[in-house]
Regions:
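Catalytic core of membrane glycerolipid acyltransferases/transacylases, capturing the structured
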Residues: 21-45, 51-53, 68-124
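A hydrophobic membrane-anchoring feature enriched in long, contiguous, low-charge segments
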Residues: 4-29
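Generic preference for hydrophobic
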Residues: 60, 73, 95-96, 202-204
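Glycine-rich helix-loop-beta junction characteristic of Rossmann-like nucleotide cofactor-binding loops
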Residues: 62-66
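Non-catalytic C-terminal accessory region of glycerolipid acyltransferases
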Residues: 128-254
C-alpha cells in the first residue's frame, strides 16, 4: 500500500509540474514578490498531495523564534520535503543552490523565476563572492535566504561537512541566522520512492546574531545547535504515526 500511495504521489507531481511551469513562465512580467507567491503555491499543492496520498504531515516547534525581518536560514538537509515546506513555513525566500538544478526541464524553469543564488560549487572564493553580492541584494529586497550548509541531502543519523558560505554571508551582511533542524529524511529519504506516513518535526532555533563573530565561529555554533537538536529528536524517537490531534493542528500548513 505504501508503494502504491507513493507512486500515486509521484504520478500526480509528474502531471502537475509541466503545466505549472508554464504558468510560472507567464509570471515573468509580475513584480518579484507577486511572482514568488504564484509560483510557490505549487509547493502548497505538493504538500497537500503528500498529506492526502502518503499520510505525511508536519509539526513546527519554535515558531515564536521566527523573526519579522529578512533572515538567513541555515538548515539540515535530508530530503526534498524541506524545499517544499519551507516555502509555507517561512516568509518569501530565495535559495542558494547548485547551478545545474536550473537545467532540469520544467522544474528548473520555475526555480529560475524565483531568482535563486545559483552557484558553481567548485568555484571556491568566486562562489563566496557571488553568494555575498547576490545575497545582500536579495536581503535588501526583503527576501529571506535559505542555505543548506551540508550542501547535499544527508541520511538520517549522519552529518555532512558544514560549508562556510552561509556563515560568511551572515557575518559580511550583519544578518541574523535562524538554525533549523528536522527529521524529514525519516519519511522521505534521499532518492527514495517510498514515502512513509507519519509526522515530520521541524525545530526552529533562536536567531543567532553574527555580530563580532568570525564565519568559522558562527558556522560551528550553527552546526552545534542543529546537530544537538537532531540528537534530541533521535533520542526522543520522534518518528511516529500521525495522531488526529497533530493532523488537525497542521491542516492549515499543508
Amino acid at each position: 500500500m505504501i508503494l502504491l500511495r507513493s507512486l500515486l504521489f509521484l504520478f500526480s507531481l509528474v502531471l502537475l509540474t509541466p503545466p505549472y511551469s508554464l504558468v510560472a513562465l507567464l509570471t515573468f512580467p509580475l513584480p518579484t514578490l507577486l511572482r514568488y507567491r504564484v509560483i510557490s503555491y505549487w509547493s502548497r499543492i505538493a504538500l497537500w498531495l503528500l498529506r492526502v496520498l502518503c499520510g505525511i504531515r508536519y509539526e513546527v516547534r519554535g515558531r515564536e523564534n521566527i523573526p519579522t525581518t529578512p533572515t538567513i536560514i541555515l538548515a539540515k538537509h535530508q530530503s526534498a520535503w524541506e524545499t517544499l515546506a519551507f516555502q509555507q513555513i517561512f516568509p518569501p525566500q530565495v535559495w542558494v543552490m547548485k547551478r545545474s538544478l536550473l537545467w532540469v526541464p520544467f522544474l528548473g524553469w520555475g526555480l529560475a523565476m524565483l531568482r535563486p543564488i545559483a552557484i558553481d560549487r567548485e568555484a571556491g572564493r568566486a562562489a563566496l563572492k557571488q553568494v555575498t553580492e547576490q545575497g545582500r541584494d536579495r536581503l535588501q529586497h526583503g527576501f529571506w535566504i535559505v542555505i543548506f550548509p551540508e550542501g547535499t541531502r544527508v541520511e538520517p543519523g549522519k552529518t555532512g561537512r558544514y560549508g562556510i558560505g552561509g556563515a560568511w554571508l551572515a557575518t559580511h551582511t550583519g544578518t541574523q541566522v535562524l538554525p533549523i533542524a528536522h527529521n524529514a529524511g525519516e519519511f522521505w529519504g534521499r532518492n527514495a520512492l517510498h514515502k512513509l506516513p507519519g509526522v515530520i518535526t521541524v525545530s526552529i532555533g533562536p536567531p543567532i546574531d553574527p555580530a563580532d563573530m568570525k564565519p568559522a565561529e558562527l558556522n560551528e555554533k550553527v552546526q552545534a545547535w542543529i546537530e544537538g537538536e537532531m540528537t534530541k529528536m533521535q533520542m526522543a524517537g520522534v518518528k511516529h504515526q500521525a495522531s488526529p490531534q497533530v493532523g488537525a493542528r497542521q491542516t492549515s500548513h499543508e
